[in-house]
Structures are given as C-alpha cells and as structure tokens.
Amino acid sequence: MLKIILFLLFLTPVCFINNMYWMVQIMLFFISFIFLLMNNFMNYWSEISYFLGCDMLSYGLVLLSLWICSLMLLASESINKYNNYKNLFLLNIVILLLLLVLTFSSMSLFMFYLFFESSLIPTLFLILGWGYQPERLQAGVYLLFYTLLVSLPMLIGIFYVMNKTGSMNFYLMNNFMFNYDLLYFCLLCAFLVKMPMFLVHLWLPKAHVEAPVSGSMILAGIMLKLGGYGLLRVINFLQLMNLKYSFVWISISLVGGVLMSLVCLRQTDLKALIAYSSVAHMGIVLAGLLTMTYWGLCGSYTLMIAHGLCSSGLFCLANVSYERLGSRSMLINKGLLNFMPAMTLWWFLLSSANMAAPPTLNLLGEISLLNSIVSWSWISMIMLSFLSFFSAAYTLYLYSFSQHGKLFSGVYSFSSGKIREYLLMLLHWLPLNLLILKSESCILWL
C-alpha cells in the first residue's frame, strides 16, 4: 500500500516537467498493473500503519480508482493538445487519485471522513477549471452544498462513536451494536447523499453535465462508490437501527429508480441521460445493500465496480461525439452509424453492459441484488420489474436514437475515431467482461 502512496506523491513534481503528459499517463497505468499483482485474496487487513491498511473490500475500489484515473488522462487529450493548463490538470488528477487511494485504504473512521470530504476539492477544481459552460459555477455550488450540509452531522456521529467505543478502527468497532436513532441518521445521511439516493440526487446530473469528460469519469466511476463503500463499512455496527428503518430507504430507492428511469426516457442531452441512469443504478445498489443479506452486500459491491467501468465508458463515448459535432444534444447526435461506423460497435457493447447483458459484471451484480431485495420483501418485485424494463428501455433509446436515423445535415464530413479512443473504449469494456471470470473476488471480502 505504501509504495502506491509514495509513488503518487513523487509523481506530483513530474506533472510540471514539460511534455510529460503521456509519461504521467503511462506511469498511472504502470502503477495500476503493479497494484493488480499485489492482491493477496486474504480476508484480513494488510496494515501499513495504525490508520492505513487494505483488505479485499478496499482492494477492488483502489484498483478501480487507479484504472479510471489513468483512463481519464487518455480521454482528456484535448487538454494536452490545446495546452489548457495541462500541468495543473495533471497535478489535480494525481492529487485526487492520492486522496481516493487514502480514502479507500483508511482503517480509522475519522481518517476515512477526512479523505472522503477532501476528495471533493480536486473534483470541484476539475468542474470549475475545465468545465464547458458558465453554469459550472452553479454545479460546483450544488455539489459542495449537498455534500457538506450532511457531512457535519456525520462528524458528530463519528465522535459519538469514538466516545462510546474508545476506538475508531473499523475492525474493532464491529464488536459494538448501537441502538441510537440519531447516530444512525447522522452516519447514514452523508453516504446517502454521496450515493446519491433519490431525493438528494439533484447535484449529480448538474455536475455531470457541466464537468469535462475527466470530471464525469471520476464522478461516475469513483465518487458515487465512496458512499457505497462507506455504507458497507458502517452498516456493521448500525444493524439494529437498520432493521428498524431500512424499509424507508429501500422504498425511496426503488420508487426513485423507476422515476429516474422515466426521466431518462425524455432526456435530449446525452450526458444527462447517462447521469440519470447512474442514479437509477445506484438506487438498486443502495436497496440491496440495506437489506443486509449476504447476496445483497456482495451484489452491491459487484454492481458498484461494474457501474464504475460501464458509465465511465459511456461518458467517454458521449465526449467522442461531442468533440466531433460540438453538441451533446440527441437531435444532433443522430445517425452516428453513418458518421463513425466503428464507434457504433463500442456504443453497442457499452450500452448492452449498461442494460446488464451477459457476460458483463453488471449482470452478476443485478441478479444478486434482485435476489436479495425480493428475499427482503416479495412486494418489491413490482418496482424491480419496472426498474429492469425501463433500464433496458432508456438504454435502447440512447443507442437507437444516437446510432440510427438520418445524419444531421449540419455535420460536414464523416470522421473515423482515433486509435486512442478505441483503446480507451477497449480498456473500459475488457475488465467489465473479464472480471466475471474472477467473480469470486467480489464475494471473498465479506
């Protein structure tokens, strides 16, 4: 673990050397492969200090962070090309990655809180510094206020836990059970906003639409997983409360997931559609997680990792069209089958992954989640069937509207994709489909 953290620390000065953009990118790839070979598949903490360590649960998410961050640099080639403060951009991404690695590998609840909140700052800089429209200021304010409003109660909750148990270590707190309503809400709300749960999701589509492609990738890929990861960690000692209140969150998530799917069906903005579909997916993750069944926890973890790769890839595809056509509107992104025939393959593969078609990791996650939610209450089948149906519906809508139909007449010439873009898509799609062969790693952590 320490070698990763020091590696990232020493990568920060490299960002300021001229023409080192691709060097940093290759270095991040390199470190993600090193980390891939570091797995021990043992369900204990490999500790490096009193508050940093890594177990199977954090391993997958740290790997996802390293992978997505190296792909972010691959996707943001235009920043390098037009020299849009690229040194600061690199620095921003490396610091963000460092904070994320520290978040996922902290064993102390307070350290987790510290890095959890501080990873917001580089994300905000990404949106405000490299976003496209002037409305990005509003998106930044939304992002900041939604998250910070609930983070103070969480801090108070953490100190209460510290006061009662005398420890903040995740492993030592598993022996305790709290039966205190206020603590439950304090600790849970911060993660619900970060997930985001329906009703507190409004910052997400806004942030996605205004963010540059790298901001969208990190937001969809990792930031949404922070909430799920935090829940998986704290749900252990909040079990008694959760049995009492979980029906509220599960109902909101399932109904909200269906409503979000319906909202997806009337989007004209490519990025907004993918953002709203993220809310629907994270709704089912949240519902499965709060059932507190074995299948539910494993399924939520699986779907979190799968969704990180899948929606990140879709945002990259939307950006490829945006760079060619200068618009994200579905009225202009039509008939892309004529425009970029080879990209249609990637559109299809990633859209089908979003629908949870086999052999993707999404399928495994969704089947486990459906199992767990139905075992919690069979009435939820009503909402789940709608959710599955509309999920397929809006994905097909996204695919068919953007790829088929007449080409928009304002498009001058057809253009093929660059090798860089095909590589980017392949590196999103390949782990998504190969991880199903190593699916026991999504279960072993529990």
Curated annotation (Swiss-Prot):
Enzyme Commission number, as recorded: 7.1.1.2
GO process annotations (BP): ATP synthesis coupled electron transport; electron transport coupled proton transport
Catalysed conversion reaction: a ubiquinone + NADH + 5 H(+)(in) = a ubiquinol + NAD(+) + 4 H(+)(out)
UniProt keyword Mitochondrion present: yes
Residues spanning the membrane: 4-24, 56-76, 93-113, 114-134, 141-161, 182-202, 212-232, 245-265, 272-292, 297-317, 330-350, 373-393, 426-446
MF-aspect GO terms: NADH dehydrogenase (ubiquinone) activity; ubiquinone binding
InterPro entries: NADH4_N (IPR000260), NADH_UbQ_OxRdtase (IPR003918), ND/Mrp_TM (IPR001750)
GO cellular component: mitochondrial membrane; respiratory chain complex I
Top-level taxon: Eukaryota
Record carries keyword tRNA processing: no
Compartment list: Mitochondrion membrane
Membrane topology: Multi-pass membrane protein
Pfam families (UniProt xref): Oxidored_q5_N (PF01059), Proton_antipo_M (PF00361)
Keyword annotations from UniProtKB, A to Z: Electron transport, Membrane, Mitochondrion, NAD, Respiratory chain, Translocase, Transmembrane, Transmembrane helix, Transport, Ubiquinone
Family: Belongs to the complex I subunit 4 family.
Role of this protein: Core subunit of the mitochondrial membrane respiratory chain NADH dehydrogenase (Complex I) that is believed to belong to the minimal assembly required for catalysis. Complex I functions in the transfer of electrons from NADH to the respiratory chain. The immediate electron acceptor for the enzyme is believed to be ubiquinone.
PANTHER family: NADH-UBIQUINONE OXIDOREDUCTASE CHAIN 4
Protein name per the record: NADH-ubiquinone oxidoreductase chain 4
Biological classification of the source: Eukaryota, Metazoa, Ecdysozoa, Arthropoda, Hexapoda
Gene name of this polypeptide: mt:ND4
